[in-house]
C-alpha cells in the first residue's frame, strides 16, 4: 500500500550488485528496487538513478536508495567513517530530485534534518537494524519503516537470528505510527531469505515484506562481478563468516584465506588496530608495504571481500530477477496453504 507495489519484495541496496538494471527489474516485476550508494559522489548517484529510471516500464514506478550512515565520533566505533565524504546534503537533494519513494539508512540512524527534509518531499525513510533496541532510536528521529536483518544476512549484520529478531521488533513497534503516513510502522524482514518459504516465514512472524540480498546477487541483471556470483553458487552452509577486518564493523562475507588467517592468527592485531581507529586490512597493508612485502595478483584477488549471507548455501543457479520473484511468490503461497492445512492439526 505504501508504495503501490504488487509483491512484498524489496531488493537490498547492495551497492554494485544492486545496480540500476537489477533495481529496475525488481520494480518492473512488482517489487521495490533499491540501489546501494556506498561511496557514491552526488554526480555518480544521479547518473545511476537516471539509468535506473531509463529501464522502468512505468516511469512513475517506485524505487529507493540505500546509504551507509554510521555515527562518527563520540561513543561510536573509532573505525567508523563518513562514507558520504561530507556530501550527504547533496546526496539527499539528488534523491529528492530523482523522484525516489524510499530512502534507506544502514549501519546507523539518519540525522533528523535529513528525515525531515525527505518527509517534506513525500519520501519515506527506512532504517536497517540488527537488534531490537535499535528500533526505538530509529523511531525517535521519525523513521517510517524498520528493516530488521538477522545475523544470517550478508554484509553488515548483527548477532540475532532472523526468527528471533523479527517477532521482537514487531512487538517493539506495535502501535507506533509513521510521521509521514500516520499509519502503523511496518517491519521488513531480512537475513537468510532466499525463496518462498522464507517469505512465508517472515509474513507469519509479523513482517510486512522482505528485504532480499544474496539471492539477487545471483540474478542475471545484478551488477556483481562473475567471480562474486560464482562464489555464491559454490558456497556451503559453513562458508561465510562475520568479520570486522574490512570495514571495522561486523560484516558477513565468504571465507577466504586472508580473512581466515586474520581471524585465527591475528585477533590481537585486529583489536589493536581498531583501538587506534584503523581498519585491520588497511593497517595490515601498510605494515606489509613498510616491510617490503609484495602481494601477488592472486593474493590481492583472494583478499577482496565478497559479501553474501548464509542463504548462499541454498543458491545453485544464476537466474533472471523475474523468475526469482515468480518462484518466491509461488513458493510462499504454497507454504501458506500448507500452513492452513496444518492449523487444523494444532
Spans of features found by a protein language model:
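Active-site entrance/lid segments in N-terminal catalytic domains of soluble metabolic enzymes
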Residues: 1-180
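Gly/Ser-rich catalytic serine loop of serine hydrolases
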Residues: 15, 155, 189-197
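Short, structured patches in soluble enzyme cores that scaffold and shape functional sites
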Residues: 107, 150, 189-191, 214-216
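Conserved active-site-proximal phosphate/metal-binding subdomains
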Residues: 159-186, 194-346
Amino acid at each position: 500500500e505504501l508504495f503501490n507495489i504488487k509483491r512484498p519484495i524489496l531488493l537490498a541496496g547492495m551497492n554494485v550488485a544492486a545496480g540500476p538494471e537489477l533495481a529496475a527489474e525488481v520494480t518492473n516485476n512488482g517489487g521495490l528496487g533499491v540501489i546501494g550508494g556506498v561511496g557514491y559522489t552526488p554526480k555518480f548517484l544521479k547518473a545511476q538513478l537516471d539509468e535506473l529510471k531509463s529501464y522502468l516500464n512505468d516511469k512513475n514506478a517506485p524505487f529507493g536508495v540505500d546509504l551507509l550512515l554510521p555515527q562518527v565520533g563520540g561513543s561510536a566505533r573509532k573505525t567508523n567513517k563518513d562514507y558520504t565524504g561530507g556530501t550527504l546534503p547533496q546526496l539527499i537533494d539528488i534523491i529528492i530530485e530523482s523522484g525516489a519513494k524510499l530512502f534507506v539508512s544502514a549501519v546507523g540512524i539518519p540525522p533528523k534534518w535529513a528525515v525531515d527534509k525527505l518527509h517534506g518531499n513525500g519520501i519515506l525513510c527506512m532504517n536497517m537494524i540488527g537488534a531490537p533496541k535499535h528500533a526505538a532510536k530509529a523511531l525517535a528521529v521519525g523513521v517510517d519503516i524498520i528493516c530488521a536483518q538477522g545475523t544470517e544476512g550478508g554484509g553488515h549484520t548483527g548477532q540475532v537470528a532472523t526468527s528471533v529478531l523479527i517477532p521482537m521488533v514487531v512487538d517493539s513497534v506495535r502501535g507506533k505510527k509513521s510521521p509521514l503516513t500516520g499509519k502503523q510502522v511496518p517491519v521488513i524482514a531480512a537475513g537468510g531469505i532466499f525463496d518462498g518459504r522464507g517469505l512465508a516465514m517472515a509474513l507469519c512472524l509479523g513482517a510486512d515484506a522482505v528485504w532480499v540480498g544474496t539471492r539477487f546477487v545471483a540474478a542475471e541483471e545484478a551488477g556483481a562481478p562473475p567471480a562474486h556470483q560464482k562464489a555464491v553458487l559454490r558456497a556451503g552452509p559453513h562458508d561465510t563468516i562475520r568479520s570486522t577486518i574490512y570495514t571495522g564493523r561486523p560484516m558477513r562475507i565468504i571465507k577466504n584465506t586472508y580473512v581466515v588467517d586474520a581471524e585465527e592468527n591475528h585477533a590481537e592485531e585486529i583489536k589493536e588496530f581498531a583501538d587506534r581507529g584503523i581498519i585491520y586490512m588497511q593497517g595490515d597493508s601498510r605494515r606489509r608495504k613498510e616491510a617490503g612485502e609484495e602481494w601477488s595478483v592472486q593474493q590481492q584477488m583472494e583478499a577482496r571481500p565478497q559479501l553474501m549471507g548464509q542463504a548462499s548455501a541454498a543458491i545453485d543457479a544464476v537466474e533472471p530477477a523475474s523468475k526469482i520473484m515468480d518462484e518466491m511468490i509461488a513458493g510462499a503461497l504454497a507454504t501458506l496453504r500448507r500452513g492452513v492445512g496444518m492449523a487444523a492439526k494444532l
